[in-house]
UniProtKB/Swiss-Prot annotation:
Lineage: Eukaryota, Viridiplantae, Streptophyta, Embryophyta, Tracheophyta
Enzyme class of the recorded protein, top EC level: transferase
Protein name: Probable N(6)-adenosine-methyltransferase MT-A70-like
Keyword Methyltransferase (UniProt): yes
Annotated organism of origin: Oryza sativa subsp. japonica
Family under the similarity heading: Belongs to the MT-A70-like family.
Length: 706
């Protein structure tokens, strides 16, 4: 009966203590709210009357007496300063009501073993902050979410304690975490927190932590000095010493086997929190189900204690020098504030939004994609089918493109591959190894009947308009230096590959620099783009010519040259000092043309062919940039003739014109010249080159540059 009376007295005392704690919390909240009202009244003078009107309506609706709001200027004039973290009054501990007083008949170990309340939440917060390696600033709400996540290392008992504390505070788990952070900052200084009002909401940020001080929040740090090895029980003298007979001991005489791993070190086989090891002794102050020292104990200097010692040795305790403190201070001053981080984040989001393609740009880019997927076939890295079968260990080579070695009677395989491969000018006498495409099937025709037929690679063409819309290829054999450019009309795109005089032996004639400067290129364009191929010393001369012709250089395309085996060329006959593996194409703009931007890249990787022949990838790329416009190529040869292009050069086969307007003007200027075909096809619509613009007015899939 006396024990029951004592227990009832303890419960009554606990209830009184809880009531007093709640009253303190209510009073503190009221003071805080009055401080907020006082700070807001400076911005909104009629704040208190408006609050009183609302409270009066609520009181009348609930049949309760109305108490006017006191004037906040009377006693809360300095309330905003009280909201700062270092001036904030300590909150009452509502978790004290969950701690029962030790009864005379209970042991301290059993009382300390019950987890819960503020102490358990402080431990959870400390563990979560220590797990942030490296540490990054975090707010209380995010910290609460990490504690409540399933991946958290907190046990169910600790999560229950967090929920109970949040319920006692009358808020969410974030309020319990805020209370724990304040207590840690006030008691040990393990965290540096700052509270601010953002968007009308209170936010608590953890800016920095002290790991050495946070370790004191862990229960194993508090119980470590109490760990003492259990005294060895006094055993009676063994009867085996007296005689040679082995007498089994009784269960009362059997000594418990000690652990193989000392208690002052973390277990050699760590387990999840909540699991215990049989034979491990209970440690006072550690909740049941929680193993002591699951984390290695770290002393004040951050040194892990080894062996059975309690702390680091004196020679390990190194005090921070003045230079280290200055570095820490400088690092703290250079840290971005929360507002600076928010501004940086906002700026990054704006940049991402600005550089993101618009819906129109995305639709235009989708229009130029190849229908039916990519039409490219990959080259096998093993080069030949024999090497492919040998490397893969199969009887059949892969379905990629392979080559076949050409072994002539004069070929010496010990010399290796020819540097020029299919561009070699002495294939009949060259002793190096050459290659050709291996088109022979790797599977006999009898067996290939059951397999799917190989996909045929078709020639690349514009998928967004028909060949009839592009028109037929046209060309004029002439001397560009004295040809009448004014009869050609206006063009949207011009591409030129001039025979620059680069002071080298070339298989074709060259033009002097002054002849290039005086070309009548300005008569060909008022609004459009020009693509000028340059090499060697002609790079600077090409830029000068663009400026003289009225263009502004805006881009530069690089052609990376590859050989027959799709490898970068390392040897060649160009370059005074280094072997040239690339060529440059200057891009100039005149006027305000209608073009598609950000469709293609400025790098082309293509195989070299005849001398001075440029990659065919240029023609579809220029059609994508300026679709359905007239296009002209200067210094062209017969392999440059493409649909929709007019070619000029002195190595073309006569004159071929299908545009009736252009034929009429050419015959008027050069009546003695023969034009093919004798009568142009009626299906081709004439294009009036006398118009003042180089684009059709109906084109709507481009944009004018700013």
């Amino acid at each position: 009966m006396e024990a029951q009376a004592d227990a009832g007295g303890d419960d009554l005392a606990a209830m009184r203590e809880q009531c007093r704690s709640l009253e303190e919390a209510i009073g503190f909240r009221r003071e805080t709210q009055m401080g907020l009202v006082a700070s807001l009244q400076r911005l909104v003078p009629d704040l208190v009357p408006s609050l009183d009107r609302s409270l009066r309506i609520i009181a009348a609706f609930n049949d309760r007496p109305f108490v006017p709001t006191p004037n906040p200027d009377g006693g809360h004039g300095k309330s905003p300063a009280a909201l700062k973290p270092h001036h904030r009054r300590a909150l009452p501990d509502p978790a004290r009501s969950t701690r029962r007083k030790t009864s005379p008949g209970s042991s301290p170990a059993s009382v300390a073993a019950a987890p819960g309340g503020l102490d358990a939440v402080r431990t959870m917060v400390a563990v979560c902050l220590l797990e942030l390696v490296p540490f990054a600033e975090i707010d209380a709400a995010a910290l609460a979410r990490r504690l409540q996540a399933e991946s958290s290392s907190a046990s169910e008992a600790e999560r229950t304690a967090l929920a109970d504390l949040a319920a006692e505070l009358g808020g969410s788990a974030a309020s319990a975490v805020v209370l724990a952070l304040r207590r840690i900052a006030e008691d040990t200084g393990g965290v540096q927190i700052e509270e601010a009002m953002i968007g009308g909401k209170s936010m608590t940020m953890v800016w920095a932590i002290d790991r050495n001080k946070l370790l004191k929040e862990l229960p194993e740090s508090a119980t470590l000095p109490l760990l003492q090895p259990p005294p060895a029980p006094q055993m009676p003298p063994s009867e085996t010493d007296a005689g040679s007979a082995m007498i089994p001991r009784t269960p009362q005489q059997q000594q418990p086997q000690p652990d193989m791993w000392p208690h002052s070190m973390p277990p050699i086989f760590p387990r999840p929190r909540g699991m215990t090891m049989q034979g491990m002794q209970r440690v006072p102050g550690v909740p049941p189900g929680l193993m002591p020292l699951q984390r290695p104990f770290m002393g004040p200097a951050g040194v892990i204690t080894m062996g059975g010692g309690v702390g680091p040795s004196p020679n390990q305790q190194k005090q921070k020098s003045e230079e280290d403190e200055l570095k820490d201070l400088e690092l703290l001053l250079n840290k971005k504030t929360y507002r600076e981080k928010q501004n940086t984040k906002t700026g990054e989001e704006l940049l991402d939004l600005i550089h993101r393609p618009t819906a129109k740009e995305t639709a235009v880019a989708a229009k130029f994609k190849t229908k039916g997927g990519s039409q490219l076939k990959e080259y096998c890295t093993n080069l030949t089918k024999e090497d492919c079968r040998r490397q893969s260990g199969s009887f059949v080579a892969c379905d990629k493109v392979h080559f076949r070695r050409i072994i002539a009677p004069h070929t010496d395989t010990n010399l290796g591959d020819c540097s020029f491969l299919d561009t070699c000018r002495h294939t009949k006498t060259c002793k190096y190894v050459h290659y050709e495409l291996d088109q022979t099937p790797d599977i006999p025709p009898m067996m290939a009947g059951a397999l799917a037929p190989p996909r045929q690679i078709r020639l690349q063409r514009a998928e967004y308009c028909s060949e009839v819309e592009l028109g037929e290829a046209q060309w004029i054999n002439c001397d560009i230096r004295n040809f009448r450019m004014d009869i050609l009309g206006q063009f949207g795109v011009i591409m030129a590959d001039p025979p620059w005089d680069i002071h080298m032996e070339l298989p074709y004639g060259t033009m002097a620099d002054d002849e290039m400067r005086t070309l009548n290129v300005p008569a060909l364009q008022t609004d459009g783009l020009i693509f000028l191929w340059v090499t060697g010393r002609a790079m600077e001369l090409g830029r000068e010519c663009l400026e003289l012709w009225g263009y502004k250089r805006v881009e530069e395309i690089i052609w990376v040259k590859t050989n027959q085996l799709q490898r970068i060329i390392r040897t060649g006959r160009t370059g005074h000092w280094l072997n040239h593996s690339k060529e440059h194409c200057l891009v100039g703009i005149k006027g305000n043309p209608l073009v598609n931007r950000n469709i293609d890249t400025d790098v082309i990787v293509a195989e070299v062919r005849e001398t001075s022949r440029k990659p065919d990838e240029m023609y579809p790329m220029l059609e994508r940039i300026s679709p359905r416009t007239r296009k002209l190529e200067l210094f062209a040869r017969m392999h440059n003739a493409h649909a929709g292009w007019l070619s000029l050069g002195n190595q073309l086969n006569g004159v071929r014109l299908v545009d009736e307007g252009l034929r009429a003007r050419y015959k008027a200027a050069y009546p003695d010249s023969e034009v093919q075909p004798p009568s142009p096809p009626r299906a081709s619509a004439p294009i009036d080159g006398d118009q003042g613009t180089s684009q059709k007015p109906t084109v709507s899939d481009g944009e004018r540059p700013a």
